[in-house]
Amino acid sequence: MNFETIIGLEVHVELNTNSKIFSPSSAHFGEDPNANTNVIDWSFPGVLPVLNKGVVDAGIKAALALNMDIHKDMHFDRKNYFYPDNPKAYQISQFDEPIGYNGWIEIELEDGSTKKIRIERAHLEEDAGKNTHGTDGYSYVDLNRQGVPLIEIVSEADMRSPEEAYAYLTALKEIIQYTGISDVKMEEGSMRVDANISLRPYGQEKFGTKTELKNLNSFNYVRKGLQHEVERQAKILRSGGQIQQETRRYDESTGETILMRVKEGSADYRYFPEPDLPLYEIDDSWIEEVRAELPVFPKARRAHYVENLGLTAYDAGQLTSTKALSDFFEAAVAAGGDAKQVSNWLQGEVAQFLNAEGKTIEQIALTPENLVEMIALIADGTISSKIAKKVFVHLAKEGGSAKAYVEKAGLVQISDPAVLIPIIHQVFADNEAAVADFKSGKRNADKAFTGFLMKATKGQANPQVAQQLLAQELAKLLD
């Protein structure tokens, strides 16, 4: 019997506000344990939460970006559970009326076609703290993360393969990153994924019993974990067994999923409205104010790059991989740069430099205008492509005008025959053996002189002019 795979994803995205959702403590990542806490985070008796407006702004922005309806009368709920990293013994979340609902995004499939994935809801909530179990026999609680704002984005079970789940996550991350509400760095925990998966015989409408997968620390692990779960569940069903509703974790060392616990239902959390927070009204003017801040999203940018700027689909995809890179490219084109040349530099020397330095485009000193200026210096023969690489490194590290640096550093390309011919004659005088080889007809002997000339001019000889003059002067040696 063959089975259809049914997948839905729950994605927690950490919002990059300066302070936490209900307290004034810093939400910054990477501080010393418990440095970013106060009495609200520690749940001291009598303290009351105060909602951070910036979190609601981010929630509205996410909902709009994901084509969602917005609950204009918004409230919060208590999700009750006990764990050491949760000192209140409940989490403030949203249950029956999330900030966003009934949304969708479009994903691109391997064959180039597209598919719409529905999004059931997006709700705001606070993160929990972090437990660390030491080798000394003690467990330690760090509440820096307690109260950091999250938005949980819950898809419908519309994905039919691990590959579709991977494509959905890629598209979702791209959209969220473009809104600016999160850096969506999985390695820092600002994007976390739980997957729900079940199988059913083809033709059956009713979903099978699902399992939830956790410990999915990368999109690749999501794909691998889901693939293993497809195989595990299919094997059980084909042998006449039944799937248990449970939570499993993915073990990257074995490539298998391992049982964690029997899955709880929402009734186990005893949700009820949060009594310490009021009902919040999100009016149309607030929504439109946030809508005005939305950027042009990657799909539209890629279409523009291909249809109007003449780039390939591949180049367009690379340039829109981050909003910062796409913005840089567009600014360079607006400054007069040729789209293809700018694209080549960004995907070539610039990308190599960023990878080597471990930086992003906005973290270096290079500006779009300076890159365009440097490309123009190549085009008009002021510098060679080889010298341009040196100029670029300087601009990336120090910034400033490309033209000013080229002139100050003496990097202007030598194209004047009156300057180059005497240097060529000196090269002949300094390399008598090579001259003798050339005169005797030794194969490829003439090619050595190109290297000699470039060395003598410290790479500043115009390659095309140099080749022409070398051929001319070498011919005279045979007269």
UniProtKB/Swiss-Prot annotation:
Catalysed reactions listed for this entry: L-glutamyl-tRNA(Gln) + L-glutamine + ATP + H2O = L-glutaminyl-tRNA(Gln) + L-glutamate + ADP + phosphate + H(+); L-aspartyl-tRNA(Asn) + L-glutamine + ATP + H2O = L-asparaginyl-tRNA(Asn) + L-glutamate + ADP + phosphate + 2 H(+)
PROSITE patterns: GATB
Enzyme class: ligase
Keywords assigned: ATP-binding, Ligase, Nucleotide-binding, Protein biosynthesis
Gene Ontology biological process terms in this record: glutaminyl-tRNAGln biosynthesis via transamidation; translation
Role summary: Allows the formation of correctly charged Asn-tRNA(Asn) or Gln-tRNA(Gln) through the transamidation of misacylated Asp-tRNA(Asn) or Glu-tRNA(Gln) in organisms which lack either or both of asparaginyl-tRNA or glutaminyl-tRNA synthetases. The reaction takes place in the presence of glutamine and ATP through an activated phospho-Asp-tRNA(Asn) or phospho-Glu-tRNA(Gln).
Name of this chain's protein: Aspartyl/glutamyl-tRNA(Asn/Gln) amidotransferase subunit B
Gene name for this UniProt entry: gatB
